Amino acid sequence: MDNVVLIGKKPVMNYVVAVLTQLTSNDEVIIKARGKAINKAVDVAEMIRNRFIKDIKIKKIEIGTDKVKNPDGREVNVSTIEIVLAK
């Protein structure tokens, strides 16, 4: 699981650097995000593909839904994405 980058609230370039670092030692990197961070995950994948490593491939994209309990105790659905980049 060391080749997984979880996308959160930091700036996009932080995650781009994290993915590039993972790609130096792994042939595949998994970018994961939930909820509002999904667009940032797509931005990270596209920046790497278009600006840094032109020949990298998007091996797989999975979308789904997680059930999460909010502070009120109710279950809410949160969208998820998993993007697999491969050399």
From Swiss-Prot:
Signal peptide: none annotated. Keywords: Acetylation, Chromosome, Cytoplasm, DNA condensation, DNA-binding. One of its GO terms (biological process) is chromosome condensation. The modification N6-acetyllysine is found at K9. InterPro entries: Alba-like_dom_sf (IPR036882), DNA/RNA-bd_Alba (IPR013795), DNA/RNA-bd_Alba-like (IPR002775). GO terms for molecular function: double-stranded DNA binding; RNA binding. Acetylated. Acetylation at Lys-9 decreases DNA-binding affinity. GO terms for cellular component: chromosome; cytoplasm. Belongs to the histone-like Alba family. Binds double-stranded DNA tightly but without sequence specificity. Involved in DNA compaction. This is DNA/RNA-binding protein Alba. It comes from Methanocaldococcus jannaschii (strain ATCC 43067 / DSM 2661 / JAL-1 / JCM 10045 / NBRC 100440).
